[in-house]
């Protein structure tokens, strides 16, 4: 179980209203007690952007988060609690205020070669793959390739010296104590064809680059963890994930949420068969990074139209599937936030510790929008309250933590009877049956065994097991 952590919004350790490394260190027990085994730390490098994905210095910590000593203390505390920590590295591009880019604009070598300058007027016709937007930005009269907009000019990996520079970046952060990396925009390293003058993914070249970078890291730290962000179809995801060892399963995240939100057992069965079968075809080469939400997506409760019982059902389905789960900060509280491609602060809102929105450690860099004070989603309002969303969420996490064998199971079959979905798993404990009731009415389980409830209500009625609506149970055989 990994916890995706956005420092700015999490916990303030010095009273300036901005989350930081000291604050995160103070809340490591909170993360560990949730049942987490690792932390995915969003970018902490110097950056003018609130999200941190446009970097001005790959070797420096954003001073709002602290310094190198603070980072070492945070990592020491995490490792003391047996929490691994991976750093999110956006290596595809920089900020236009990065020293490399400023020197490139001045024509200084080798920096000029580290960015792609316009070489033909025909290139200006190139458009972005997903929305047909312009990919060239003008900086003081010079056109530079910037796929993600003028705030993020792309690095040009045609330059061998840039490859060496990136290796130095990786070496530095490993030496500080990180256990690995989440690589942002992994398929975008080579995504413009100089020969054709168009945007075109060059997957074989990208994979060659990542092979060299991951090999470099593993030579330093053999147990280094890598997670790739490749938002694409199954075939492409497989290609990249086999290099990194863990690949995010985006199709599963999207399809699972849609099926649960619509209370559609037929869609859930289809999603699980389609998205998990793809994973098992490549099981020998990588592990599925399972998740429901992240910083680029609408939060879980919002995707369930505010229905927290549906959100908990989606979580239970996810955490009973094979793979390595990643959970986004604040989801344990039921925080809300709707994704906007051009303004995603809403799903990066401050983690709400106190019901009135104020108190020691509460971050205040952004006014609370969806999660207004007195909304009932704060840690203070829910902690220790039986039946609260937080306590139910935590119980589901505890179930997964207490059953690590689920991570390496194989799905033998998936079936449905009305609103009840049954999944047959095979793992180190033998065979197991999972039952998920996607409907509102009770469902009778066809079993002579003794299932155990994971979430919701399971009762023995008239000699048979009855699973309440939006509830889940498991029956382990041959243990």
Residue ranges with predicted function:
Residues 36, 178, 186, 323-324:
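A structural motif
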Residues 1-167, 171, 175, 188-237:
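Acidic/aromatic-lined carbohydrate-recognition and catalytic surfaces
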Residues 441-458:
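Beta-strand-rich binding/interaction modules
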Residues 214, 218-220, 231-232, 241-243, ...:
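Loop/helix patches that line or flank the sugar-binding groove of alpha-linked glycan CAZymes
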Residues 52-61, 196-198, 245-255, 344-349:
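Short glycine/proline- and charge-enriched loop/turn segments
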Residues 461-479:
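C-terminal beta-strand-rich structural cap/linker in extracellular carbohydrate-active enzymes
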Residues 102-144, 262-281, 348-375:
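Core domains of carbohydrate- and sulfate-ester-processing enzymes
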């Amino acid at each position: 179980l990994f916890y995706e952590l956005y420092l700015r919004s999490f916990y303030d350790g010095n009273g300036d209203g901005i989350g930081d490394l000291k604050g995160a260190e103070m809340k490591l027990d909170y993360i560990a007690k949730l049942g987490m085994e690792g932390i995915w730390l969003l970018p902490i490098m110097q950056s003018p952007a609130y999200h941190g994905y446009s970097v001005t210095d790959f070797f420096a910590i954003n001073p709002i988060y602290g310094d190198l000593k603070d980072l070492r203390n945070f990592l020491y505390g995490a490792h003391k609690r047996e929490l691994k920590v991976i750093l999110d590295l956006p290596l595809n591009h920089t900020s236009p205020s990065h020293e490399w880019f400023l020197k490139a604009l001045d024509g200084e070598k080798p920096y000029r070669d580290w960015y792609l300058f316009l070489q033909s007027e025909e290139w200006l016709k190139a458009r972005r793959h997903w929305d047909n937007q312009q990919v060239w930005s003008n900086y003081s009269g010079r056109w530079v390739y910037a796929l993600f907009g003028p705030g993020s000019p792309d690095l040009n990996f045609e330059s061998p010296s840039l490859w060496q520079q990136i290796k130095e970046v990786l070496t530095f952060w490993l030496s500080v104590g990180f256990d690995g990396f989440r690589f942002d925009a992994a398929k975008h390293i080579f995504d413009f064809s100089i020969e054709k003058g168009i945007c075109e993914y060059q997957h074989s070249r990208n994979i060659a680059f990542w092979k060299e970078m991951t090999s470099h890291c593993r030579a330093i730290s053999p147990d280094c963890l890598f997670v790739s962000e490749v938002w694409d179809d199954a075939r492409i995801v497989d290609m990249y994930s086999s290099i990194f060892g863990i690949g995010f399963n985006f199709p599963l995240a999207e399809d699972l949420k849609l099926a649960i939100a619509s209370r559609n057992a037929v869609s859930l069965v289809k999603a699980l068969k389609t998205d998990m079968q793809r994973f098992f075809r490549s099981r020998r080469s990588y592990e599925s990074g399972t998740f429901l939400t992240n910083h680029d997506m609408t939060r879980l409760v919002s995707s369930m139209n505010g229905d927290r019982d549906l959100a908990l059902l989606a979580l239970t389905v996810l955490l009973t599937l094979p793979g390595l789960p990643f959970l986004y900060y604040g989801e344990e509280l039921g925080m809300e936030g709707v994704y906007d491609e051009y303004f995603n602060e809403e799903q990066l809102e401050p983690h709400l510790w106190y019901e009135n929105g104020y108190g020691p450690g509460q971050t205040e860099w952004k006014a609370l929008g969806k999660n207004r004070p007195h909304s009932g989603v704060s840690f203070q309002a829910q902690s220790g309250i039986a039946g609260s969303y937080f306590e139910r969420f935590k119980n589901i996490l505890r179930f997964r933590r207490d059953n690590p064998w689920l991570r390496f199971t194989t799905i033998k079959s998936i079936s449905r009877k009305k609103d009840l979905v049954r999944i047959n798993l095979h793992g180190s404990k033998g065979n197991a049956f999972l039952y998920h009731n996607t409907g509102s009415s009770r469902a009778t389980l066809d079993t002579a065994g003794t299932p155990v409830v994971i979430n919701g209500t399971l009762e023995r009625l008239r000699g048979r097991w009855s699973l309440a609506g939006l509830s889940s149970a498991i029956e382990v055989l041959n243990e």
